[in-house]
Amino acid sequence: MSAIESVLHETRQFAPPAALEQAATISGMPAYRALAAEAENDYEGFWARLAREGLAWHKPFTKVLDESNAPFYKWFEDGELNASYNCLDRHVEAGNGERVAVIFEADDGTVTRVTYADLLARVSRFANALKKRGIGKGDRVVIYIPMSIEGIVAMQACARIGATHSVVFGGFSAKSLNERLVDVGATALITADEQARGGKTLPLKSIADEAIALGGCEAVKSVIVYRRTGGKIDWHAERDLWMHELTAGESDQCEPEWVGAEHPLFILYTSGSTGKPKGVQHSTGGYLLWAAQTMKWTFDWKPTDVFWCTADIGWVTGHTYITYGPLACGGTQVVFEGVPTYPDAGRFWKMIGDHKVTVFYTAPTAIRSLIKAAEADDKVHPKSYDLSSLRIIGTVGEPINPEAWMWYHKHVGQERCPIVDTWWQTETGGHMITPLPGATPTVPGSCTLPLPGIMAAVVDETGQDVPNGQGGILVVKRPWPAMIRTIWGDPERFKKSYYPEELGGRLYLAGDGTVRDKDTGYFTIMGRIDDVLNVSGHRLGTMEIESALVSHELVAEAAVVGRPDDTTGEAVVAFVVLKRSRPEGEEAAALAKTLRDWVGKQIGPIAKPKDIRFGDNLPKTRSGKIMRRLLRSLAKGEAITQDTSTLENPAILDQLAEVR
């Protein structure tokens, strides 16, 4: 692989606000450098100190890091704890039971407040109900539920009894849900009658029924249903149970199941570049430590904060910065069921004012869509709302382009709130590279520097460091507590995916092209180096989308690539070969719509191609390999400048370039 060219040269820089810096957990760059030096000088001692200070251990650990079976690293292995106890009981026992844990705003604007004592009681009742259904330590429970207090309760209840949860985003199809139910070997499924978003409903229970009917889910003995809307649903006696009926008679006391630090807290599926989704397995101790620690560092968390992460609990951001991180700190957070544009595009800004949000964390995709709305209508512009409570704002899910960063800084942060542009992944468990609000001078479009203890680097294809200013591959040189432990059921795929022999087998491969600034050493993410697409902050495997297209009766072959998109960051572009002659004009437009809807049904709406082009063939080498780099150029509307000497059918390029 040749060196990646860096084309972004950003010179604007913004210092942390003086008042915030003075009171920050990490105050000033000397404090940051001191922590980073502590980690470099005594790596195990650094992590041991954080783990002892940050978590409540039922049985203290004596071992910190076991590297004997690398890359299957173990952290705090002989220690015992419980995630739910750390998120709930210890705050109640400390006298903070009446502190508000969650301010929940429903799609229709209804607001519910739940204290730590209330949440502990609800989690305990549901945990007792799960135990009565025979669910316990080591079982896997799939959760397919809307954004809700009940979703948090379900996750925490699983953690309380030692069951491993696997949350599936509510936008996924029956087929995608079935794949995850089968792969994880779920014994129970927790879902809802319907999901309410943007004034519309989605029939989650019927999708769940369809997923189970697809087969391979014989282990699922219980389907527990949260009644969200009261909508009509099919009912399967013995298997289906109402959540509210199950918990009604249960005790609000449930002794936590103490588990080893390496016990799997959850398995979360993320797309791979080769077909089958990857079940990313996370531990209890190391993961929870980092969820809490990054709240304190990245968001400078204070007991007086009202934190709001706009993610869904179906993604890792919702796990770490809704279900676990804020609660592990004992904080108050806003949880939102709806979408940023309903009933209008001022919803986020109104909620910040209504709930006096102090720390706001959202995705660049949301920001870009709200910029468009705000510029078209002053009524939904941030300037029309009271955002004075904000002190820190952040971004997650994908790199944010400098123009959107500056708009966010000016109109939402009011030029006084630092932006924490966070880089991390499902596999990393929590933030890895990010500004610190009271220490790091920020630069639009850059995630700046690694957190203390995170040994990130940019290397070439042989694993050798590249000089600052030259693009390369982002890696992490040493294990960290919150890291992925394995891919569920596929340890060989884990090693090949994240610790490839090409890089020596000891460097964690992030899969992002990255460059470090020549002067500051700041990291800037340049995009994925493999074929995983990042659409609205969601990672989607091209192979999954291609497989969905080819499963349609009219499709013979398909290739999917991404292209830059102002709203979603990256858009899905599909090149399709039919089993019959290539359609044109209105026929092509109608069939493209049919195939978009088909992909939405097979995978979920997020995977629908924005552009479908029909060709008589795909550009292939003589050995039959699809030349995706050429398709990427065509998708972007660029002239083909690459070597096409190995191309078997050069004329197809002109045909695919002409089709829109």
From Swiss-Prot:
Signal peptide: none annotated. It is an enzyme of class 6 (ligase). One of its GO terms (biological process) is acetyl-CoA biosynthetic process from acetate. It comes from Burkholderia lata (strain ATCC 17760 / DSM 23089 / LMG 22485 / NCIMB 9086 / R18194 / 383). Its EC number is 6.2.1.1. This is Acetyl-coenzyme A synthetase. Acetylated. Deacetylation by the SIR2-homolog deacetylase activates the enzyme. NCBIfam families: Ac_CoA_lig_AcsA, PRK00174.1.
